[in-house]
Amino acid sequence: MLRAVLQANKNGVPLSKLQAEYKSFTGEPIPFKDMGFHALDAYLKSIPSVVRIEVSRVGEVICYAVVCKETARIAALVAHQRSSKKKSGGQVNCQMRLKYTAPVSHFGKPKATLRQPGFTPPQEKIIRKPVPTSAWGKGNTFGSRTFEYSPPPIPQLFGIAPIQMHLPNINRPERKVTLPPRFQREVNSFLNPTPMTDSNANHTQSLKSVVPGSGQPRCDLSVIQNNLKELLNKHSNGLWLSKLPQLYKETYKQDLGGEMLKQVPSWTHICMVQKLVTMGHTEMVLYSTAIKQPSFTKNVQNHSNNQAKPNVPVDSTPSSPPLQSSGNIPKDELKQKISKVLTKYSNGLWYHALPKVFEDMFKQKLPTEVLNLDSLTDICTVDLISEEPFKAILYAKSAERANQNSNPSVNNNIPQKLQDRESPLLPEEPEMNMTPPPLVIPSEASPSVLVVELSSTNDVVIRYIGRDYSAAQEHMEDEMKDFCSKSSTAKIGFLRVGQLVAAKAEEDVWLRAQISAIEGKKVKVCYVDYGFSEIVDITKVCKLGKQFYTLPFQATKCRLAGLEAFCDDSIIIKALELKACGKILAVEILEKSEKPLVVLYDTSGDDDININAACLKELCDRSLSLQLKANSSFSNVIVTNVCSDGTLFCQLPSKGLAKLYETLQKVDSEFQSKQVTSHLYVSLPFCGKICLYHYKGKWARVEITSVHSSRALDVQFLDSGTIASVKVSELKEIPPPLLRDLISIPPQALRCCLADLPLRIGMWTPDAVLWLRNTVLNCLECSIRVVKVDEATNMVHIYLFTSNNFPDLERSINRQITNEELWKHQKDVFLNLSASTLESSRGGGAQASELSPPGLCKDHTSAVKKPDMQQSSSVPSFNMPPPLPLPRPGEHMDVFVSVACHPGHFVCQPWQELHKLEVVMEEMLLHYSTTEEKPVALEKNKLYAAKVENKWYRVLVKGILTNGLVSVYELDYGRHELVSCRKVQPLIEKFMQLPFQAITSQLAGVSCEHWSEEASIVFRNHVEKKPLVALVQTIHESTHPWDRRAVAYIVDTSLPDTDIWIHELMTEYHIQLSKPE
């Protein structure tokens, strides 16, 4: 199956995405650990007959399939499945066209026009029509990608591009974060871009403004001409025609129409026109008729020189003292002397220095008329440097070139290469003002990036990895190689600082580059798609064709969240270079801006590593860390937390603990002395951020571990090890004066385990955990003896003693807990102990788990006794929530598919109600995380609130198992889960107002009763976790809302020009599957 998945991807599958790709088709990840391999790449290297591994140009590891005829048919089916999963284009299709179905086992046809679930407002229809198709939009596939120049306006076009992939918060695969209001406004600006105007309409409008007899107000021609005279007199050194409209508007607060601008060169009584040919295109300079017009060579070329400056065409002429001729010098002789001067200065001679140098060399003054550069075009070329003051460099022409100018017949004797190099380029469309469009930040939740280099945490150069980014760039570079190697027009004859060119790098690769300096025959270029600079020979620089301006520069900068205060710290920079540079990482984008604020994650190992948090920990003062050794003993130890697997967190007396108390007192004084303002509170929470939380009258350091919404999140107390759910509004930023002091103190919670007890046995029994918590958490003074320090797992093996039992090992907690019959209890403690007993035994710390450790557990088959209803609270009695209103047959609704088993069973949620469900779940999280647990007498088919993966859901209990687990059905999402009975709490009436959101559904239009696993995978990949449109065929009502069932057509309307009817796709799949091989 692995080979088939790889064969369906002709361009290979990145190693970082292979697991997800494999799971999307099979439903399971590659079980490489079960086969004895520690990493996926190690397993792939062991099967060279199936997988071929290569490293791409950008350093990404790509996996390719080794061809096998046996899997060709499976690969074809996978490829067919993939073909209908193309990403959408730059626009969103808000209207679904009526499409007649094929007569193959269909029962009915859709009869309504449907709409795409809430992406764009109605004005999107107006925006879409004049928008040209984007060559770099997401609708293009990699194989058919073209790089044609798209005319402006570019910013509006790219404002629309991200709309298609921006799904709601509920559809994010990981780290579901509800955006704060200030960030939500920014997203709304992407979803509601400013409507674009038709450039043709603007042009027509400008024409009407100057056409006589039109209905528009007619401009006074004499006023415009007088204004132009004033401008040209002010700019006696000349004025670019292309700059005239802007200057005119700034001076006279009026627009100079495009048609009027075309007429300006023909007004010979007002201005004179000088045409210049630079870089193969023609520019015009205007001069007042009252000022003598300077002349420049029409074929301006560039020569390498040691005084390289930006080559900007000039507007001004030098003011030089009047020179008198030294007699009647023949013209040819004068040119020969000037040629000798220029030949002596092989790197060029400044124009204003020519008279002085000529006089020093020949003891004669240079005639004034010679300063007209038109008369020197046959012996020198001119490099125009700046406008004000006038600067130009003169270069001597070769003898062959001078002869060529004087005698065209000599061309036959000149080598063809020389003629090609020095032949003037034909005028063409100017490219010096062309700029690529801005880089659009990917809309996916966690895009991949390659970290190129960094000089500060606020200036980290990255490149996005993906089809529309690195893959598109590789395709463009292949085209650049063909263009620069074969096209004769690609040769460049004029260089300037800041110019975009194509530069030849190693391995015969051509890259886009920007010139940053010119020194002799060497050019320093910055590769704009990679973010680093290099010095190359001038012969390796080529003209950048306009087709290569369509792709945005791929190298961009970002800021690392949480490291702003230490952006230039050498320790942070060194750690970041070691952990991130040259690696492909996942990125979580917190703020989308010109320089995004991000969190980097290394996902190459078994666990995701937060690079930002890992670098921040490098600031810890090692001198404050505990130096633990085997057989060392400590007294006055405080046990701060007991976890459900028997892990303990302890605080030992140390210099670090003393400094922590002292610094936290300063924090308290700082907050009391200042007025409470908004900047003291955490405004942008993210995983790995360290902040302060006020707990039991004292400030404590906490690290954010999970963000549930804009109001609720999970934190871990750094100095006690406790995990809790808190409100965002309860967190405060560390005061800047004390930030480094608090960060430098190592966490004071020492992670320990009891020696001589089995490790990695899973969760302890609830009775054992509760006994341990009751014994050690209430003891003010404990003692420990260190047995072993495991640095690999950051675990300390200890013997734990209460205050009166040290150092007798037989009376240690380790011995007492094994002597107790705590491991025999398999029934959940809440179902067998009275509420008063539980309340008296409850302590602080993390929740105890529900599972029994295998190996210590002996009674696996004991039955659960019926709970005593008098000993625990029962479910409150109140009315059911109102039933969810469903459309009638023939009507449609926008839905989100939360669960998809097969076409005969999937679960939908009403799209328009999702935001209400998010609010309810957020309130449930805050309510149950801040209230004390209650013992609950669980009953089958009753409603409760249950905690599943750090979130609370409204559930229906389906069964109670003998090992303390409860089978529940999520009434809003349609999933079945197993949870600990201690994670089930009464569902209060406050959370019963919203109708249950899960709609059990069946696909209409298909007749198959039994679906194969392969067909189920195809169906799941096309509908699960996606916003779709449902056309209801039948509603089967029932007494209970969770037993209602809908039969509906499902349609994917996300593509710009195609609607995917899921029942048609499944029917076609069955036909393909039933064909003979």
Curated annotation (Swiss-Prot):
Keywords: Cytoplasm, Differentiation, Repeat, RNA-binding, Spermatogenesis. InterPro entries: LOTUS-like (IPR041966), OST-HTH/LOTUS_dom (IPR025605), SNase_OB-fold_sf (IPR035437), TDRD7_LOTUS_3 (IPR037978), Tudor (IPR002999), Tudor_domain_containing (IPR050621), Tudor_TDRD7_rpt2 (IPR047448), Tudor_TDRD7_rpt3 (IPR047449). Residues 1-67, 220-289, 330-398 form the HTH OST-type domain. It holds the Pfam family OST-HTH. Residues 494-551, 684-741 form the Tudor domain. One of its GO terms (molecular function) is mRNA binding. GO terms for cellular component: cytoplasm; ribonucleoprotein granule. Residues 857-868 have a biased composition (Basic and acidic residues). One of its GO terms (biological process) is lens fiber cell development. Its main location: cytoplasm. Component of specific cytoplasmic RNA granules involved in post-transcriptional regulation of specific genes: probably acts by binding to specific mRNAs and regulating their translation. Probably required during spermatogenesis. This is Tudor domain-containing protein 7. Residues 300-331, 841-883 are annotated as: Disordered. Belongs to the TDRD7 family. Residues 300-328 have a biased composition (Polar residues). It is found in: Cytoplasm. SUPFAM superfamilies: Tudor/PWWP/MBT. It comes from the Eukaryota. Disulfide bonds: none annotated.
